[in-house]
A protein has these predicted regions:
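Short catalytic/metal-binding and nucleic-acid-binding patches
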Residues: 1-185
Length: 185
């Protein structure tokens, strides 16, 4: 093939847009349940809150599970910090669970997927999705009952108009990557 390009991109380029909402999903390697215990889920949540703040990303919603997590955050002016932020989060949490398990150098995280949310409807639908993910996975009957996500805070503190918009949001045509089955606690 004479016209075949020398470099064929295997993934589309990432959009790094300042002050824009992103949804991120990450999976553990082979969907292993490294974060099954409550103390490990707390560790994951605390690291997520700490690392996103350190990089200037403003969390809007988050949910952590035994083998994956989702979050929505507004990017800072330099949205290209997404990759180093995720690398730091994964490195920090992997070292912590490896230390708890008495192993070193074990790979914990597989990869992550990010989506730039460019419409209000997409944002509301994804907020709904993240907050209700524990219900989707049948870990709780009501999202507010799951302690490792922001749904309880959102229900208690978000403006009522926003809560109603999110509640009414229909699932986006392209659901987030989520074929995980978390371990029951």
């Amino acid at each position: 093939m004479k016209d075949h390009p020398q470099r064929w991109p295997h993934r589309p380029p990432h959009l790094f847009i300042p002050n824009t909402m992103y949804m991120v999903t990450a999976s553990t390697i082979y969907k292993q349940h490294f974060f099954k215990a409550a103390d490990r889920l707390v560790l994951c949540c605390e690291a997520l809150l700490e690392v996103t703040a350190a990089y200037g990303w403003e969390l809007q919603a988050w949910a952590a599970f035994s083998n994956h997590y989702h979050f929505i955050a507004q990017s800072p002016e330099d949205a290209s910090t997404l990759k180093p932020m995720i690398q730091r989060l994964h490195s920090q949490t992997a070292r912590a669970v490896n230390r708890l398990d008495g192993v070193s150098g074990r790979q914990v995280w597989f990869q992550y997927w990010d989506t730039c949310l460019r419409t209000d409807q997409s944002y509301y639908a994804r907020l709904n999705y993240v907050h209700n993910n524990a219900v989707k996975h049948r870990l709780v009957q009501a999202a507010e009952q799951y302690p490792y996500c922001s749904a309880g805070w959102f229900t208690s503190n978000a403006d009522i108009a926003l809560r109603e918009q999110v509640k009414a949001a229909t699932p986006h045509s392209t659901e987030p990557h989520d074929d995980f089955t978390p371990a029951e606690g």
